[in-house]
Amino acid sequence: QLHEHGLALKNQGDIDRQFLAGAISTGTHGTGINLQNLSASVLGLQLVLASGDHVQCDKANEADLFEAARLGFGSVGLITAIEMELAPAQVLREGGWQANLDELVGQIPALCERHERFEFFWFPQSDLATIKTIEQVEEEPQYPLAAEGQRQAFSFEVLPSHRPNRHTEMEYSVPAELGPECLNSIARLLR
């Protein structure tokens, strides 16, 4: 519905099957070193607390409650309304390719700087990684939509990923400068 009003989320995860309140309160994020998770765009919340009280909160009113609730995994209360900072609707172009993991690891910092959104998926049973980049473009969407990795369309059509394969996904938080060595250590352990 945002698109009908010329608007979009500033960032979103690559899974679009959850409710907005759940995506916000779990820290759902996309990729990009200069993009924040969804909770950073929240300006205000309406909550129903365990006591049954209805509370409206933001940075000026009930600020501590607001900060706890917007990334609180639902522990503070039930989110019943959200006020968010939005972006104008945008066309994104997706690119993708495969590379050898060992070669890719040394390029990660440069790829993060070069691309608005950069991510990769490594398949531990092989030496290959699938790379995905997404850039905002000042061009028209291209329909019908191309295959994933080649789409050029509005953000809500490009950012979600199709996941037909069963998989287990894990996310770790390490300082960015230690990321390549951390990945190399995991790869050595699994090989």
Go through the PLM ranges and name each one:
Residues 1-191:
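Noncatalytic alpha-helical scaffold of FAD-dependent oxidoreductases
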